[in-house]
Amino acid sequence: MTSSAAAIRLGFEPFVNASPVELRTNWSDSDVQAVISATYRQVFGNEHLMLSERLTSAESLLASGNISVREF
């Protein structure tokens, strides 16, 4: 079984099918949340983390524009 087939069987979409997410100029709060979710999904393999596992200070800095997505 391939990893894509296993991902589908387990109920989540493989990364191959995910489109790139960018944070461009004049972003909205929903854009920031989409980037944060995509980052958690790519780095941790899961965007649904427990509250204690979330990087709340980094999320806040990103949402306020104090750091870039790369720095996040």
Curated annotation (Swiss-Prot):
GO terms for cellular component: phycobilisome; plasma membrane-derived thylakoid membrane. The lineage of its organism: Bacteria, Bacillati, Cyanobacteriota, Cyanophyceae, Pseudanabaenales. Residues 1-72 form the PBS-linker domain. Belongs to the phycobilisome linker protein family. Keywords: Antenna complex, Membrane, Photosynthesis, Phycobilisome, Thylakoid. It is a peripheral membrane protein. The gene is cpcH2. Signal peptide: none annotated. GO terms for biological process: photosynthesis. The keyword rRNA-binding does not apply. Gene3D superfamilies: Phycobilisome linker domain (1.10.3130.20). Its main location: membrane. Pfam families: PBS_linker_poly (PF00427). This is Phycobilisome 37.5 kDa linker polypeptide, phycocyanin-associated, rod. It is found in: Cellular thylakoid membrane. Rod linker protein, associated with phycocyanin. Linker polypeptides determine the state of aggregation and the location of the disk-shaped phycobiliprotein units within the phycobilisome and modulate their spectroscopic properties in order to mediate a directed and optimal energy transfer.
